[in-house]
Amino acid sequence: MSEQHSVAVGKAANEHETAPRRNVRVKKRPLIRPLNSSASTLYEFALECFNKGGKRDGMAWRDVIEIHETKKTIVRKVDGKDKSIEKTWLYYEMSPYKMMTYQELIWVMHDMGRGLAKIGIKPNGEHKFHIFASTSHKWMKIFLGCISQGIPVVTAYDTLGESGLIHSMVETESAAIFTDNQLLAKMIVPLQSAKDIKFLIHNEPIDPNDRRQNGKLYKAAKDAINKIREVRPDIKIYSFEEVVKIGKKSKDEVKLHPPEPKDLACIMYTSGSISAPKGVVLTHYNIVSGIAGVGHNVFGWIGSTDRVLSFLPLAHIFELVFEFEAFYWNGILGYGSVKTLTNTSTRNCKGDLVEFKPTIMIGVAAVWETVRKAILEKISDLTPVLQKIFWSAYSMKEKSVPCTGFLSRMVFKKVRQATGGHLKYIMNGGSAISIDAQKFFSIVLCPMIIGYGLTETVANACVLEPDHFEYGIVGDLVGSVTAKLVDVKDLGYYAKNNQGELLLKGAPVCSEYYKNPIETAVSFTYDGWFRTGDIVEWTPKGQLKIIDRRKNLVKTLNGEYIALEKLESVYRSNSYVKNICVYADESRVKPVGIVVPNPGPLSKFAVKLRIMKKGEDIENYIHDKALRNAVFKEMIATAKSQGLVGIELLCGIVFFDEEWTPENGFVTSAQKLKRREILAAVKSEVERVYKENS
């Protein structure tokens, strides 16, 4: 029998469930606090980590020096006629990384907390504090200030739509909000509904001497503040720096108000890919035990010499937990952004990866696929001889051919240099990634670890431990949860076959959705189990493998089910596909792929097919039928090479004109597809594909 990574801790309640299981190392008792820690609140945990770190560098960030604009005119077919469209590209000039020690983080945490209390935000849960901002060092410092005063934080994605933002602000009766200067204009309408907001803090001073973008940043922020004052003259407005200064001057006047374990720490709003955002209620006890669970699976693998690059939304539980894990390891937490990760969108400076040189990087499938395709595009530009050398080295490493370490290091050196040259682990979480993509990164860069969890469980479920590495699974149960599978009869998954819906229980599992008893009753059992909505299976080693989200399993005309996310992860690995939404109509046999094409590789492909000439803009050929059909054939070849068969093979594809971003409403901030919105935009074209295949 193979080594077991989880163990049964009791008997199955009935024939429709598996026995509950835990990580084999916590069979007797799941963790409620991190190893070697006595903390039971986030404030105690932060203080413990920061004191241990002392004068070591603990946090790093870059400032925006300038934003450069480049305009480009493209020609598109609109209603059968050529139309010129002007597009603007932005390029960021960034400062070198600035550092702050762990000791300084203690000072900032306390100064910010005292400043918040001094301006009028009440501690110990009397007031709630809303954060509507992009990931940055100031986001985290505001959060730390709040927990030092026992002020619950409400998080919302910085790309949350107006209705969702109003919903989260009004429902929680938040008294204060922190936002980015660039988001101030988005606050004007919500603040007219959210009457409980009395304090607004913005992340940068509004300085008339700010000449970035020819003064546009200053003017936009100033105009937004003036309009906010018009509609809400009662709101007190401060910059981040002003609040810290107020706190520094109030050391002898304002006391700290540390929270208790059962106190509310955070209401984290989901991104709402289908329904209205739900507020997940998380206590200090929940989050600290969640940090314990995730940390348990990577304990000893990551430490104080590591540098973690942070760029995912901090409103996402996955990112929040891993930033606190970085504090726990006493490594350096460095902030970046998707826009400045590589040299592609920077000017007069290096991208975050090369500048910061991370050893650990956390990402989601959409980001990793973009990185992989950029690498593959560079490889395709090499001479045929160099391409052959690259793929020969790849094949030898994949097959573990002895004595090829030096060769692979030399061949893959440039790829590693492009990501800073020091990565030892990368992690994917939030959505499924294809085995091909996981294998590619693990061979040419470093091992890709898979993590799986939910907001409701503080990102706790599974983390693939480095010494248990295997492709295609989400890994070992973390150290703080108990898991079981239950039958999903209508979809044909049964516990007796070690398959079913995953239910989780333990200290990280929240108890409710904020002011939402109906959703709470649907998702939580009377005895504390959380229904994840994910269909999974136990592997022979006691690890977990995800089949798909229950809501993403669609029955087709012939009565068989297809797993949408599984198909998307495979088709997305094709070099011509930047993103894809697989749509399955229950009245049809096969699905259709709605594809955002990858412009670089597609341009070369179109030239190779003699559909366009070298130097022409691919956007003018997006709707060329011959090009679309050629890409479709390539996608089917990709699918077959990765084991897709029958109804998993698309019957056709349509091309989408623009990239899907949180800003245009086609994906959430966590890069999850908004399927309804995507389908609505190309419904007639999807119907055309079905008609052509009927």
Curated annotation (Swiss-Prot):
Residues modified to N-acetylserine: S2
Stored Pfam families: AMP-binding (PF00501)
The protein's required cofactors: Mg(2+)
> Which residues are recorded as binding ATP?
Y269, T270, S271, G272, S273, I274, S275, A276, P277, K278, G279, V280
| UniProt-listed InterPro entries | AMP-binding_CS, AMP-dep_synth/lig_dom, ANL_N_sf
Sorted UniProt keywords: Acetylation, ATP-binding, Cell membrane, Fatty acid metabolism, Ligase, Lipid metabolism, Magnesium, Membrane, Nucleotide-binding
* Activity versus pH, per record: Optimum pH is 7.7.
Output the superkingdom of the source species. Answer: Eukaryota
Q: Where in the cell is it found?
A: Cell membrane
UniProt motif (FACS) ranges: 527-576
Instruction: Give the signal peptide range.
Output: none
One Gene Ontology term from the biological process aspect of the record: long-chain fatty-acyl-CoA metabolic process
Chain residue ranges for the region called Disordered:
1-25
Q: Which EC numbers characterise this protein's activity in its record? A: 6.2.1.3
**The protein's assembly and partners:** Interacts with FRK1.
- State what this protein does: Activates endogenous long-chain fatty acids (LCFA) by esterification of the fatty acids into metabolically active CoA-thioesters for subsequent degradation or incorporation into phospholipids. Acts preferentially on C16 and C18 fatty acids with a cis-double bond at C-9-C-10.
Q: Write down what this protein is called.
A: Long-chain-fatty-acid--CoA ligase 3
Organism (species): Saccharomyces cerevisiae (strain ATCC 204508 / S288c) (Baker's yeast)
The organism's taxonomy opens as: Eukaryota, Fungi, Dikarya, Ascomycota, Saccharomycotina
The gene name on file is: FAA3
